[in-house]
Structure formats: C-alpha cells, structure tokens
C-alpha cells in the first residue's frame, strides 16, 4: 500500500497531540515519516511487516522517522501508551501496528470496490 489518509484535523486528535506536546513538530514529522514508511513498504495497511510477515528492522523504523534513537523510543512510548500503536505488538515483536491506518484503508478499499472506481494514477501510467 503506497498511500494513507491524513486528515486536516489530525493535529487535533488527542493521540497526535500527545506526540506534539512531548516532542514538538519534530515528533509530528517523525510520526508522519513512520506512517509513510509503513504505508509504502508494509505488507498490509497499518502493519509494519514485510512480505514474509516479519516486523521491519528497528533501524529502518528509526531512520524513517528522522529522529535520534532516544526520541524514536519516546515517540513509540507515547504512541503505545495512547493506543495509536498496538502495545502488545511492540512488546512482543518490536513491530508497529497502527489500527487507525488499517481501519481507514479498509474503508477506502470498500468504497472503491462498491463504486467500481480505481485510484487515479497521476503519473499517467496504465
């Protein structure tokens, strides 16, 4: 999946506000970078797992945020505490699973299927 939904009201979400409060806009940027990485490389929407079903390497997740490791760890703590990331998946596998991203992708896919629409390819590729 190479897309995800980002609403204009995202900064007002309490889970996102907690990130901004603790880490500032740098933390928000890191979170968006992580969302992009998971959307682009994840096997399933919202799940930071590769094509074999293995969690992404921790170094790749840290690099995707652009944050130093200490701030990445703080970001993960905030997101698992708030429920933005599934805590159980992080604790067991050091994997990132974002339920909201998964739900939104499912809704979008159902909407496309029911209306027989396909995503627009802005690159002009068939």
PLM regions and their residue ranges:
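Alpha-helix N-cap/helix-initiation sites
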Residues: 24-28, 51, 69-73
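Winged-helix/helix-turn-helix nucleic-acid-interaction surface
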Residues: 1-6, 10, 55-126
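A Lys/Arg-rich helix-loop hairpin that forms a DNA/phosphate-binding surface
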Residues: 43-55
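Short recognition helix of helix-turn-helix/winged-helix DNA-binding domains
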Residues: 1-45
């Amino acid at each position: 999946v190479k897309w995800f939904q980002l609403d204009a009201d995202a900064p007002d979400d309490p889970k996102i506000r907690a990130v901004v409060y603790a880490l500032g806009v740098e933390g928000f940027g890191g979170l968006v970078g992580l969302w992009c990485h998971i959307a682009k490389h994840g096997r399933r929407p919202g799940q930071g797992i590769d094509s074999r079903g293995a969690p992404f390497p921790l170094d790749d997740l840290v690099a995707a945020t652009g944050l130093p490791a200490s701030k990445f760890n703080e970001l993960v703590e905030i997101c698992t505490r708030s429920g933005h990331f599934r805590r159980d998946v992080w604790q067991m596998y050091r994997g990132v699973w974002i339920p909201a991203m998964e739900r939104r992708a499912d809704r979008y896919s159902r909407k496309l299927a029911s209306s027989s629409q396909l995503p627009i390819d802005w690159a002009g590729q068939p």
